[in-house]
């Protein structure tokens, strides 16, 4: 088990971050970076092989002298016997010992449920005590020790309403028309990237929201995005793209009220264009936004489509494309920050879904396939205009302000309300 302790003999209370996979690393990494800039000790627990691979190949993390890395792989193949046996090593008492050993003063995780205090039959409680995943065990242990728990955003949202997909409707139908998020009220802080996303969640859930905080987006801002893209590997387009405008199309999450057939037809039209080359990228959660084997073969048969998956990062692909085509992913914010043209074929999503693009601009929104193709093929494709308030409303302000806010708010929770601690090194340095 990897366990690198760079904290030396320091007795300072520490922030502990948990990263479960690629999405967690993407969204929590900027918070870790901001908080570690103070040179106070930070602990990062990795619970999957993918998280470990990403964290241990990030230079600024591996070179930091105040970041301790701990490997607790209980999220790989969760139903396998090997994983179940491994979880026995991370039972509740072991989780408490870990928090005590590293003098943890606060536990920071991505959004998610907060397990309630133990209830139910004794055998069920014993099973949870022994076999729960390490994230749940650490959350329970933090509650046992009276440590603050903070949930930071899982990405961001382009939507100003909650999408009422079939899955969401089923859950709400069993909970008096609301999403059952009341357990989120038990966090010391449940952080949102924007006020409009907070309002959408609170309006449709049982969460009261007294602990709901808007700190801005650590992942999407004008400080972190350029830093992230500067570290991305170079993606080389195929020879078939030479002399053509490269249109990068992110496959949407189909359950977000997206017209799948019309989306595939638009992809095929782009691939048939004489001046465009289609590059398709699936979402990080492939089961939500993948292509079937038949769809894959049909697009490949055009001879003018490149389908990318696996290790190639979204940052590398966006850097290498000429225009981004996307329906509702927050990855479009990267294009806006990088001043790259972004086209949103809004006709592909149900009209009930309203977005920040409708309110503040930033996207070329089209209402038909022909209008989309016409725009993509236009001789001069520029960045869509946006309201002057866009960065403040969507990202929470300038990047150095946002990351400094995360740093100060989290350390203040560690130090307690009576602390006069102030940052000696800001996140903007």
Kindly label every feature range from the protein language model:
Residues 208-209, 214, 330-397:
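Catalytic binding pocket for nucleotide-activated donors in carbohydrate/polymer assembly enzymes
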Residues 2-4, 373-429:
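C-terminal amphipathic helix plus adjacent low-complexity
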């Amino acid at each position: 088990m990897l366990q690198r302790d760079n904290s030396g003999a320091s007795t300072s209370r520490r922030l502990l971050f948990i990263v479960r996979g690629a999405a967690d690393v993407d969204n929590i990494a900027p918070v870790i970076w901001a908080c570690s800039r103070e040179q106070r000790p930070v602990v990062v627990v990795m619970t999957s092989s993918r998280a470990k691979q990403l964290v241990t190949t990030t230079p600024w993390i591996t070179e930091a002298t105040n970041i301790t890395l701990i490997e607790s792989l209980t999220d790989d193949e969760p139903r396998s016997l090997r994983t179940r046996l491994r979880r026995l090593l991370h039972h509740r008492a072991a989780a408490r010992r870990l928090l005590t050993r590293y003098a943890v003063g606060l536990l920071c995780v991505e959004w998610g449920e907060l397990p309630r205090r133990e209830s139910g039959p004794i055998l069920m409680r014993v099973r949870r005590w022994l076999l729960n995943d390490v994230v749940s065990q650490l959350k329970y242990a933090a509650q046992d020790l009276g440590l603050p728990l903070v949930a930071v955003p899982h990405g961001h949202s382009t939507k100003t309403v909650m999408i009422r997909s079939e899955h969401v409707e089923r859950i709400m139908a069993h909970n008096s028309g609301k999403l059952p998020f009341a357990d989120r009220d038990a966090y010391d802080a449940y952080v949102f990237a924007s006020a409009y996303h907070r309002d959408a969640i609170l309006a449709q859930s049982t969460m009261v929201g007294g602990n709901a905080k808007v700190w801005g987006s650590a992942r999407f801002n004008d400080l972190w995005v350029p830093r992230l893209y500067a570290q991305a590997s170079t993606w080389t387009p195929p020879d078939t793209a030479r002399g053509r405008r490269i249109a990068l199309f992110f496959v949407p999450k189909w359950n977000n009220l997206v017209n799948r057939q019309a989306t595939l037809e638009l992809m095929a039209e782009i691939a048939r264009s004489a001046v465009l080359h289609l590059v398709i990228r699936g979402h990080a959660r492939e089961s939500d936004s993948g292509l079937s084997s038949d769809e894959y073969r049909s697009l490949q048969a055009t001879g003018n489509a490149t389908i990318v998956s696996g290790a190639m990062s979204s940052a590398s692909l966006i850097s290498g494309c000429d225009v981004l085509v996307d329906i509702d992913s927050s990855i479009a914010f990267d294009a806006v920050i990088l001043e790259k043209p972004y086209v949103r074929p809004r006709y592909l999503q149900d009209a009930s879904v309203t977005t920040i693009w409708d309110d503040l601009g930033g996207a070329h929104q089209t209402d038909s396939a022909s209008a989309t193709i016409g725009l993509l093929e236009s001789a001069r494709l520029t960045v869509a205009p946006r309201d002057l308030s866009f960065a403040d409303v969507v990202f929470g302000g300038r990047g150095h302000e946002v990351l400094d806010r995360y740093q100060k708010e989290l350390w203040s929770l560690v130090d307690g309300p009576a602390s006069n601690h102030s940052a000696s090194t800001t996140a903007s340095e």
